[in-house]
Amino acid sequence: MMNRIHAVILDWAGTTVDFGSFAPTQIFVEAFRQAFDVEITLAEARVPMGLGKWQHIEALGKLPAVDARWQAKFSRSMSAADIDAIYAAFMPLQIAKVVDFSSPIAGVIDTIAALRAEGIKIGSCSGYPRAVMERLVPAAAGHGYCPDHWVATDDLAAGGRPGPWMALQNVIALGIDAVAHCVKVDDAAPGISEGLNAGMWTVGLAVSGNEFGATWDAYQTMSKEDVAVRREHAASKLYAAGAHYVVDSLADLPEVIAHINARLAQGERP
């Protein structure tokens, strides 16, 4: 069957590993503190999630509340040199900590096996730079998650998200003949934009990732009402970014792919 999904391109933190996407958020808070003794909140740290990490720090500096704190302390806005300094603090912290957040999210291993049984290739890309991915990839493999290909945010001269380049590099590496036969899966808006810009179907994850922003343990004990409110908040952001589908976690992906395959068979395209 030619007219079906041939590849999925998966994000990492909050999508396949690190439920709630905590590895990067906590490190941003620590890097701001370490480099300039400026406090940011976890909620603020989550706002630009999905961008490359230098661009993420730049976006944090432009948040009105963070800019106000910066102005109060330094009588100016954040500069490129400031971003470099925070990034320099961020990198060793992230490299050291990322292995602690490398366990696959519940359902990921079984889902990957089911997709591979259907002949679907598993691509991946991340807002993490290569130095971090070189630690994360083998750690995740040790836990049983090993995609067919991965691309880091600083691998390509053209750049990272929300541009299409990391997703398209997966298409090239995996030998996929049509972007309409690919699905980009992500828990943050820039990754949905990436998939759309690459001409792919896009699936947002509303519970496992950054926008929901809870640990697995917290999620397990959360009231149904709280889950519903958080899910709606996350889903609305992902749909606003243009996601074709939004589900809770990667475990829900096979059902979505069956739906997309039916649409492809009828001649639909993303």
From Swiss-Prot:
Keywords: Hydrolase, Magnesium, Metal-binding, Schiff base. It is an enzyme of class 3 (hydrolase). Its cofactor is Mg(2+). The active site is at D11 (nucleophile), K53 (schiff-base intermediate with substrate). Mg(2+) binds at D11, A13, D187. Its EC number is 3.11.1.1. Pfam families: Hydrolase (PF00702). HAMAP family: PhnX. This is Phosphonoacetaldehyde hydrolase.
